[in-house]
C-alpha cells in the first residue's frame, strides 16, 4: 500500500491508492461556471443532500432521510438533514457567488448519531458500465470553523479496486492551501469502472476526538468521461513522433 500526498498545495488531503483510480481537487469554486457542471456532460448521478438544486441547468435530485434517488443508496445507522442553513459559512468571504452553487451547498445530509470515531456512511452508485471512465465529485464547504475540523476517511470501491483519501471537511483553507476556510471545492475521483456499482464510504477516523462530526453530503455528481477518438489518438501519437524526430 503506497501513501501519496497529492502535492504541497493540497496537503490537507492524503490519498492511498491500491490501483489505478486517481484523486484531484478543484480550484476554489466561485461562479456556477467554475463548477464545471454542464448540461453538455453525460451524468449517471447528480445528487443533492437535503433539498434539490439546479446548477447550470443540471438538476441535482433530493436525497434526504425521507426520499430516495434512482440507482443511489445512502446507508447509515442514523439519517438526518439540515436545509437552507449556512451556519458559520459565509459564501461571499469565500468568493462564492453562483446562485446554483450556493443552493447546492446550503443543504446537506449527515449521520446524526454517527459523529464518533468509527462511524460510517455509505453512498452507493448503481447502474454503472464496466470499462467506462467516470469522474465522481463531492462538493464541499465548511460548517464549523472550530472543533475538530471534521476529519473524514473516504474509501471508493468498485469491484476489486479500492482507493482511499482522508482530509478535513471543515477546513477548505487547509485542503486547498489558501488559508480561506470559507472557500468551496470539489474532490474528484477518476476511475475506469470494474463493476456496475461504486461504493463510497465516509468514516470518522478512529483517531478522531469523540463527537468529531460525521460527513456532510452537500452534493455529488458522477459523469462519463468520453474515450479519446481514434483520430485524436492518431494525432497525439503523430505529434509525439514529430517531437522525437526533432530532438
At which residue positions do the language-model features occur?
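Contiguous ligand/interfacial binding patches
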Residues: 21-43, 141-224
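Sec/Tat signal peptide C-region and signal peptidase I cleavage site
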Residues: 16-20
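A short, hydrophobic C-terminal helix/tail in secreted or cell-surface proteins
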Residues: 227-244
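Sec-dependent signal peptide recognition
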Residues: 2-11, 229-233
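Surface-exposed, low-complexity/disordered Ser/Thr/Gly/Pro/Asn-rich loops and linkers
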Residues: 58-126
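Extracellular and analogous surface-interaction loops
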Residues: 122-133, 188-196
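A short beta-strand element within beta-rich, extracytoplasmic domains
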Residues: 128-144
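N-terminal, charge-rich interaction modules
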Residues: 21-76
Amino acid at each position: 500500500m503506497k501513501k501519496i500526498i497529492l502535492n504541497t498545495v493540497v496537503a490537507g488531503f492524503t490519498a492511498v491508492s491500491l490501483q489505478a483510480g486517481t484523486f484531484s481537487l478543484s480550484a476554489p469554486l466561485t461562479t456556477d461556471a467554475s463548477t464545471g457542471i454542464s448540461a453538455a456532460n453525460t451524468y449517471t448521478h447528480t445528487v443533492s443532500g437535503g433539498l434539490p438544486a439546479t446548477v447550470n441547468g443540471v438538476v441535482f435530485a433530493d436525497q434526504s432521510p425521507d426520499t430516495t434517488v434512482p440507482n443511489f443508496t445512502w446507508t447509515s445507522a442514523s439519517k438526518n438533514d439540515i436545509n437552507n442553513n449556512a451556519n458559520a459559512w459565509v459564501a461571499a468571504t469565500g468568493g462564492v457567488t453562483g446562485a446554483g452553487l450556493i443552493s447546492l451547498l446550503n443543504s446537506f445530509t449527515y449521520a446524526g448519531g454517527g459523529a464518533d470515531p468509527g462511524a460510517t456512511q455509505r453512498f452507493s452508485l448503481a447502474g454503472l458500465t464496466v470499462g467506462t471512465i467516470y469522474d465522481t465529485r463531492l462538493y464541499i464547504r465548511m460548517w464549523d470553523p472550530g472543533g475538530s475540523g471534521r476529519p473524514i476517511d473516504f474509501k471508493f470501491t468498485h469491484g476489486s479496486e479500492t482507493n482511499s483519501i482522508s482530509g478535513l471537511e471543515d477546513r477548505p483553507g487547509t485542503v486547498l492551501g489558501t488559508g480561506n476556510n470559507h472557500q468551496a471545492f470539489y474532490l474528484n475521483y477518476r476511475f475506469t469502472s470494474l463493476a456496475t456499482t461504486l461504493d463510497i464510504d465516509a468514516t470518522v477516523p478512529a483517531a478522531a476526538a469523540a463527537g468529531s462530526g460525521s460527513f456532510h453530503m452537500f452534493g455529488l455528481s458522477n459523469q462519463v468521461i468520453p474515450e479519446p477518438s481514434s483520430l485524436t489518438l492518431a494525432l497525439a501519437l503523430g505529434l509525439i513522433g514529430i517531437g522525437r524526430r526533432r530532438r
